């Protein structure tokens, strides 16, 4: 609800970062988790990229599987409040979309379980039935656990690259280390389903 797609190709979202001091995606997140049906897959096509601007992905299957049995049992059935507060504030929107989704979700095709989280406090501020103060310490643990170096892939962009990922079992982070150098990437998202 906060983005503008190309008129000529309504499924294509242009991502331009010219002249910006930072990027809204410069944090660990899963795309559009505040929607009823967040995207299943995302595809990025690098049209013009500077040196730098890498994108990193964390494997949320591994993040879940590496948890202790006690932590898995505690998280089972917990839901998080995912909000679009960060994007809403950037565009001056008065309504903030929000949804509660499982913190551990089951992939509808593979049947595997993964951690389903996003980093910024204004994107996933709390667990259902808990306050932010109660939720943040556990969320911080889950974030740190998820992004251990051996659980992260870092892609060094080159013009012409096309990368696709499964938004249901990864988090990603766009590194903004290229100043105001031109960066032009197109994104297409494939419709997902309600997380379960």
What residues fall within each predicted segment?
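Non-heme Fe(II) oxygenase catalytic core, chiefly the N-lobe of the double-stranded beta-helix
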Residues: 1-162, 167-196
